[in-house]
Design a protein with these regions (language model features):
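Catalytic-site neighborhood detector that most strongly recognizes the C-terminal catalytic loop/helix
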Residues: 284-305
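Short, basic (Lys/Arg/His-rich) helix/loop patches that form interaction surfaces
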Residues: 212-213, 237-264, 268-282, 301
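Basic, Lys/Arg- and aromatic-enriched nucleic-acid-binding interface segment
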Residues: 124-156
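N-terminal core-binding DNA-recognition domain of tyrosine recombinases/integrases
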Residues: 15-31, 38-116, 132-135
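DNA breakage-rejoining catalytic core of tyrosine-based enzymes
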Residues: 109-128, 186-198, 212-217, 229-234
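Basic, alpha-helical nucleic-acid-contacting "clamp/cap" segments
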Residues: 170-226, 239-243, 247
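Short, leucine-enriched amphipathic alpha-helices that occur as contiguous helical runs
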Residues: 126, 141-143, 233, 237, ...
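Short, charged phosphate-coordinating catalytic segments
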Residues: 149-173, 282
Length: 305
């Protein structure tokens, strides 16, 4: 039965109120994605004459089938979002039913194309990207960000979260960096990673211009002056794509780069350099060998040579 306007308002009010309980337990990006997923689900139910909460197994299956144009990862996340709201509202949860699992498996099997992976910013690309940075404060910051992100195999959110306090300048001109929190480390136990001498030099040059008195390692620059706040993680994506474009790469290649490219490219380079899986997992903070394998799929590494 289609809920009326009053019921829809009550549903929206109830779930959004309960949803706030998740704050602090999940990353902000995950919260935003779940929130958008539930909005989509509620609107779909309204248009389909169905009740969203509690949703029946039939309703959730029908919703998932309607979402089959999206990537399986997106559909799976929407299942998790629906599950979480049912749990928060103390309602019977339909998402553990076997029919839900079978519906998702059908959607996943219907996808014949391989999941798209960000183009790796390998060392050869890194060298090109560093070479096209301007000779000004923005260039100092950009070079330090690109080189540090590559050496630490960071996600973009990890890179912009680093503080000056997290960086130890070593006598051999390298850096020891504490990455405090990551997507797979919500508890914030952190991991330690190391850099090359080149990265140590680039970070030092950036800080000598900016000063050591700000907490964020990387910060915005406004009218030639550093601003004491962290950069948005979208800055990393824009930086990499802009560097690829300025380096004269093919537009299709430019489009394939993303904020994840540093992590992908560095992992591929470590594989080609002969490092074993355990060493690569430690360097990048991977907990799952299956996830790492996805990163290494496109590495140009011929084991027969």
């Amino acid at each position: 039965m289609k809920p009326n306007d009053a019921q829809l308002f009550s549903i929206s009010s109830d779930w959004q109120s309960e949803f706030k309980r998740l704050e602090g337990a999940y990353a902000p990006s995950t919260m935003r994605a779940y929130h958008a997923d539930i909005e989509i689900y509620i609107q779909w139910c309204a248009l389909s004459d169905r009740t969203p909460f509690p949703g029946s197994v039939e309703t959730v299956c029908a919703f998932l089938l309607d979402q089959d144009s999206f990537a399986p990862a997106t559909v799976r996340r929407r299942v998790y979002a629906i599950r979480k709201v049912h749990q928060l509202l103390r309602l019977p949860d339909p998402t553990y039913d076997e029919d839900i699992n079978l519906t998702f498996r059908r959607i996943r099997r219907s996808k014949t194309s391989r999941p798209r992976q960000a183009k790796g910013m390998t060392k050869s690309y890194l060298d090109k990207f560093l070479a096209v940075q301007p000779d000004n404060p923005w260039g100092l910051r950009n070079k330090a960000m690109l080189s540090l992100g590559y050496d630490l195999l960071t996600r973009r959110s990890e890179l912009v979260a680093i503080t000056v306090e997290d960086v130890e300048f070593r006598s051999d001109e390298t850096l020891r960096v504490l990455i405090r929190r990551s997507k797979t480390d919500p508890g914030g136990y952190g991991r330690v990673a190391f850099t090359s001498k080149r990265t140590g030099t680039l970070v030092t040059e950036w800080l000598e211009w900016r000063g050591y008195n700000f907490e964020p390692l990387f910060c915005p620059i406004y009218q030639g002056h550093a601003v004491n706040r962290h950069l948005s993680d979208t800055t990393v994506k824009h930086l990499i794509k802009s560097a690829a474009k300025n380096a004269g790469l093919d537009p299709n290649d430019v489009n394939d780069f993303s904020g994840h490219s540093m992590r992908v490219g560095a992992a591929q380079d470590l594989l080609k350099a002969g490092h074993d899986t355990a060493a690569i997992m430690r360097a990048g903070g991977w907990k799952s060998i299956n996830v790492l394998t996805r990163y290494l799929e496109n590495a140009e590494c011929n084991v027969w040579l």
